[in-house]
């Protein structure tokens, strides 16, 4: 058994008291990212090891695995704690996103270990989409690399405001303060171009040796700041969705018998209470909240992030994908939007193409009207392109087949985040963050139907020798 866990349970006075204490601890979701071989998996392994979150049988298995697959010689290869796929162990890299849970006396944590290779950027974006803080690892020998910049930009694009720059492998540069200072200045120069008001902190460490991870390093007396664990335990996270207006996307209509009809989902933002007047979009029909049903029984109110079932006083037509909000809020449905896109498919994104779109439980179709620009990761400049390649990041104009209720992603990730789905293979090919919904008054009318634009794109792609012109022209 985990001796640290057993001690915590004993200190709390039993399992039940310990579980109650866990419920009242704050939860921090964070990810580790950065370039390949910067030590992301090793850092997580070190955190788990030094906070005594590893069971004795896991530690014994780790010793055996280190002998077979380890890359650290005679030392424990802590990366094997999170690199679970056979291909990951054989190559010594991370491919998939690995999630791990651990807790200390002050906080609970969910870690997403993301891959560093460029071809797995899509996996990194997936891991970052649910996190509140990013640990960006930099190899002290290499400094700031392209993937460091790419992952920094993607993290901020996905709404992460807290960045911890962990300058790793300090043991390989003799724990040099000069190296730490140089990399710190290089990153700050780059970070000045990142969007948003960011909280950036720097920690010099060695994940392999444990310096400044969970305990202060004796090898770096020149550093008097907090350890990485202290930063994670004390950082204050301001959840944007708590202060935003109520948004409740309906995920499921619960009708177990003739006497009950409820609308299940997760409250995306704000709060809702019994008796509140709500409006259903896109229909615009209004009703009152009669009950708030949860697994633990009825509640008088609920808050952002809670899974609930709402029962209304009136039997009205509500289906999956509809949105409930406060009745006094005017939120118009839109049919166009500018969207920040992280493209994840080998086939590039081009104007004129159509995709299935899924957003907040609703599935519809969207046409790409044009690509405004692609972001150059090296210097964050914008350049005009005809298509968006694999791992490309850019701003795209979309037109939807039906009116949708959208928020800007930075205000509400649930009603502002979407995925692109290939209509033939049903594969997710891109992730989108609503930059700005376009009202009907400002949307430019199209003289061509969606079918005509899609057929035109198909002909130009597969029969270029026909010389068909682009119906979208310079868009």
From Swiss-Prot:
UniProt pathway annotation: Sulfur metabolism; hydrogen sulfide biosynthesis; sulfite from sulfate: step 1/3
EC number: 2.7.7.4
Annotated spans, G3: 113-116
Binding locations of GTP: 34-41, 113-117, 168-171
Every tr-type G domain range: 25-239
Record bears the keyword Lipid metabolism: no
Gene3D superfamilies xrefs: P-loop containing nucleotide triphosphate hydrolases, Translation factors
Region listing for G2, in residue ranges: 92-96
Recorded catalytic activity of this chain's protein: sulfate + ATP + H(+) = adenosine 5'-phosphosulfate + diphosphate
Domain of life of the source: Bacteria
Keyword Disulfide bond: no
Keywords: ATP-binding, GTP-binding, Nucleotide-binding, Nucleotidyltransferase, Transferase
Enzyme class: transferase
GO molecular function: ATP binding; GTP binding; GTPase activity; sulfate adenylyltransferase (ATP) activity
Region (G5): 206-208
InterPro entries registered for this protein in UniProt: CysN_GTP-bd, CysN_II, CysN_NoDQ_III, G_TR_CS, GTP-eEF1A_C, P-loop_NTPase, Small_GTP-bd, SO4_adenylTrfase_lsu
CDD domains the record matches: CysN_ATPS (cd04166), CysN_NodQ_II (cd03695), CysN_NoDQ_III (cd04095)
G4 as annotated region, ranges: 168-171
GO BP term (any one): sulfate assimilation
UniProt-annotated stretches for the region G1: 34-41
Family, per entry: Belongs to the TRAFAC class translation factor GTPase superfamily. Classic translation factor GTPase family. CysN/NodQ subfamily.
HAMAP family the record matches: Sulf_adenylyltr_sub1 (MF_00062)
Subunit-structure text: Heterodimer composed of CysD, the smaller subunit, and CysN.
Function (record text): With CysD forms the ATP sulfurylase (ATPS) that catalyzes the adenylation of sulfate producing adenosine 5'-phosphosulfate (APS) and diphosphate, the first enzymatic step in sulfur assimilation pathway. APS synthesis involves the formation of a high-energy phosphoric-sulfuric acid anhydride bond driven by GTP hydrolysis by CysN coupled to ATP hydrolysis by CysD.
Name of the molecule in the record: Sulfate adenylyltransferase subunit 1
Species this chain originates from: Escherichia coli O17:K52:H18 (strain UMN026 / ExPEC)
Gene this protein is translated from: cysN
């Amino acid at each position: 058994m985990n001796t640290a866990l057993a001690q915590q349970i004993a200190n709390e006075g039993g399992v039940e008291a310990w579980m109650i204490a866990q419920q009242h601890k704050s939860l921090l979701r964070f990810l580790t990212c950065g370039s390949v071989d910067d030590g992301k998996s090793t850092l997580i392994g070190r955190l788990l090891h030094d906070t005594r979150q590893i069971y004795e049988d896991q530690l014994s298995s780790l010793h055996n695995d280190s002998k077979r697959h380890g890359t650290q010689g005679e030392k424990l290869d802590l990366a094997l704690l999170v690199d679970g796929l056979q291909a990951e162990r054989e190559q010594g890299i991370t491919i998939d996103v690995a999630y791990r849970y651990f807790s200390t006396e002050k906080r609970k944590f969910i870690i997403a270990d993301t891959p560093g290779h460029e071809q797995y950027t899509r996996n990194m974006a997936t891991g970052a989409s649910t996190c509140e803080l990013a640990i960006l690892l930099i190899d002290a020998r290499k400094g700031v690399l392209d993937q460091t910049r790419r992952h920094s930009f993607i993290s901020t694009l996905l709404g992460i405001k807290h960045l911890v720059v962990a300058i790793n492998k300090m043991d390989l540069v003799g724990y040099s303060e000069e190296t730490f200072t140089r990399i710190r200045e290089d990153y700050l120069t780059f970070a000045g171009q990142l969007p948003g008001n960011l909280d950036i902190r720097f920690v010099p460490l060695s994940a392999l040796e444990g310096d400044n991870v969970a305990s202060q390093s004796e090898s770096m007396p020149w550093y008097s700041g907090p350890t990485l664990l202290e930063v994670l335990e004390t950082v204050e996270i301001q959840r944007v969705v708590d202060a935003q207006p109520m948004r409740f996307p309906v995920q499921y209509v619960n009708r177990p018998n003739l006497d009950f009809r409820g609308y299940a989902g997760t409250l995306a933002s704000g709060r809702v209470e019994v008796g509140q007047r709500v409006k259903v979009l896109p229909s615009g029909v209004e009703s009152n909240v009669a009950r708030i049903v949860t697994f633990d029984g009825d509640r008088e109110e609920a808050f952002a992030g809670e899974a609930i079932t709402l029962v209304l006083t009136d039997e009205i037509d509500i289906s999956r994908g509809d949105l409930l909000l406060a009745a006094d809020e005017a939120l118009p449905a839109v049919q166009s939007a500018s969207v920040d896109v992280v493209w994840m498919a080998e086939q590039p994104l081009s104007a004129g193409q159509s995709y299935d779109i899924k957003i907040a439980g609703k599935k519809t179709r969207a046409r790409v009207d044009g690509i405004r620009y692609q972001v150059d990761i090296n210097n964050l400049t914008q350049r005009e392109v005809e298509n968006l390649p694999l791992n490309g990041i850019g701003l795209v104009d979309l037109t939807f087949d039906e009116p949708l209720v959208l928020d800007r992603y930075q205000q509400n990730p649930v009603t502002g985040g979407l995925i692109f789905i290939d209509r033939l293979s049903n594969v997710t090919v891109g992730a989108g963050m609503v930059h700005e919904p376009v009202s009907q008054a400002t949307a430019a009318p199209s003289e061509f139907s969606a079918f005509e634009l899609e057929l035109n794109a198909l002909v130009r792609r597969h029969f270029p020798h026909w010389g068909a012109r682009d119906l979208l022209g310079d868009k």
